[in-house]
Amino acid sequence: MSKKSGLSFLWLSAVAFVVDLLTKYIVVQKFDLYESVNVLPVFNLTYVRNYGAAFSFLADHSGWQQYFFILLALAISGMLVYFLAKNNAEQKIQNSAYALIIGGALANMVDRTYNGFVVDFFDFYWDIYHYPVFNIADIAICIGAGLLALDAFKSEKKKVQDKQVEKCGQK
């Protein structure tokens, strides 16, 4: 009997993908470009177009970056699907991380492929400082990265504990 692989976590990719594209669709349908609706004293919903990557990285270049980010999203997603296939389903944190990153990367890739830009709309600010505007896909990618860091920390802690137990057993 074979064990379930990490591919069973791809439902999480699908959720991140669909929720991201649905929220972007709603923003594009309901907002004019740069229109902003105040939600909280530190938070607006603001429709912006991002021609680069996170924090508008490479946004001011001649257009080659669009193809670069599409290829990068495909390559990373393919690599992470491979890792999911190799992982055991019991590796919940790592599998969840990979799945969230895949969903976010592919959602932004579809947006970039279809529109030539990524729709961003979460706008947090304090006084005159505005954090870069972002979307659900960005959140999924960041949570995935955070989970990978957490998993690495937990794995390292377990290695240290295993060594301590091993030393105690040798005495």
Curated annotation (Swiss-Prot):
Q: Where in the cell is it found?
A: Cell inner membrane
> What residues sit in the active site?
120, 138
Membrane topology summary: Multi-pass membrane protein
| Gene Ontology CC | plasma membrane
Keyword field = Aspartyl protease, Cell inner membrane, Cell membrane, Hydrolase, Membrane, Protease, Transmembrane, Transmembrane helix
So what family is this one in?
Belongs to the peptidase A8 family.
This chain's protein is named Lipoprotein signal peptidase
Q: Which organism is it from?
A: Haemophilus influenzae (strain 86-028NP)
